[in-house]
């Protein structure tokens, strides 16, 4: 049986890892073992942050919608409640885009939400 030499494959593998780790500081960009460990951690961070990004954007959209709806005299909660009552199916991403880019259209949506909201007949809340 022929002898298998693995030097070429080993060097190629190590070179690829070190190239991927080229932007890291210190030993993490120069030593193979440290670079490999850091690459494994970085893959985990990337995976987790791709999922975290979705929540981050949702929070940003809600903040933008809340600010714009308060400027039009309605809180975020009541605005969303009014849109659901009016059966308007616009997602938060589009609402946030309207709030930033087209204030007149957003104001029209706020008016639709206000019209669809039931009148609050309960007694006003008092601090207990």
UniProtKB/Swiss-Prot annotation:
Highest taxon of source: Bacteria
Swiss-Prot/TrEMBL keywords: Ribonucleoprotein, Ribosomal protein, RNA-binding, rRNA-binding
Molecular function as annotated in GO: rRNA binding; structural constituent of ribosome
Cellular component per GO, a single term: ribosome
Keyword Ribonucleoprotein: yes
Single GO BP term: translation
InterPro entries, sorted: Ribosomal_bL20, RIBOSOMAL_L20_CS, Ribosomal_protein_bL20_C
The keyword Ribonucleoprotein is annotated on this UniProt entry: yes
Summary of the function given for this chain in its UniProt record: Binds directly to 23S ribosomal RNA and is necessary for the in vitro assembly process of the 50S ribosomal subunit. It is not involved in the protein synthesizing functions of that subunit.
Annotated PANTHER family: 39S RIBOSOMAL PROTEIN L20
Annotated family: Belongs to the bacterial ribosomal protein bL20 family.
Identification of the protein by name: Large ribosomal subunit protein bL20
Species of provenance: Kocuria rhizophila (strain ATCC 9341 / DSM 348 / NBRC 103217 / DC2201)
């Amino acid at each position: 049986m022929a002898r298998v030499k693995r030097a070429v494959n080993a060097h190629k593998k190590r070179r690829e890892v070190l190239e991927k780790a080229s932007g890291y500081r210190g030993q993490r960009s120069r030593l193979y073992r440290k670079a490999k460990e850091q690459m494994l951690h970085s893959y985990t961070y990337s995976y987790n942050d791709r999922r975290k990004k979705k929540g981050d954007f949702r929070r940003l959209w809600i903040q933008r919608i809340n600010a714009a709806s308060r400027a039009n005299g309605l809180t975020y909660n009541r605005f969303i409640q009014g849109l659901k009552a009016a059966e308007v199916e616009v997602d938060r991403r589009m609402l946030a885009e309207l709030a930033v880019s087209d204030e007149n259209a957003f104001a029209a949506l706020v008016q639709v939400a206000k019209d669809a909201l039931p009148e609050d007949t309960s007694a006003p809340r008092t601090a207990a």
